[in-house]
Amino acid sequence: LIAGVAAYLGDVAPHVKVIPVEYDESACLKAALEANERVILPSVGLFADGTAVAQIGEKPFDVIRLQKSDNSGPIVEPNVVLVNTDEVCAAIKDTYDECRSIVEPSGAMALAGIKKYVAEHGIEGKNMVSIVCGANMNFDRLRYIAERTELGERKEAIFAVTIPEQKGSFLSFCRALQGRNITEFNYRASDASAAQVFVGISLKN
């Protein structure tokens, strides 16, 4: 997709910059650009399955490297924006909130990348476009995405905590949170002296 967009913009709008975005567990373009040759990733993450490839294609890689902008530099920025699962889930929610459409993880990567790029570079007053490339969503995956969205939006933090296995420990833990909401709580008995707690905490704005 990015090679085709770069080739087209190189002809009709060479002043436009193309910002590559990849899922951080299958970043084959980033690896190839850093090595200046195509490489095979040892493993790829399958959450964004539409872009889960271990090696970028030969011709797309050539197009990405050779396509020039109007200032004779590469039209595709050499620094790939990497997005993680939580950021992709948040972008899926953003798309739904704005358009009432559900996109697949790979389809939401571009929006997740724009959000991250804008935040990191402090960009204001610029026209930026994300290309939604797919909506092949498995319904069973929606619950997982909904749960991860709060993390991606920095509205929830997940902690693994060890507390004493004794009366009053949970109350003391809640008091230590100073009024923050507990969004999730999982307890597993491990031994007689300590309890392992997996807890989600709502973050204040």
Spans of model-derived segments:
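Active-site-adjacent helical/loop segments in soluble small-molecule enzymes
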Residues: 7, 57-125
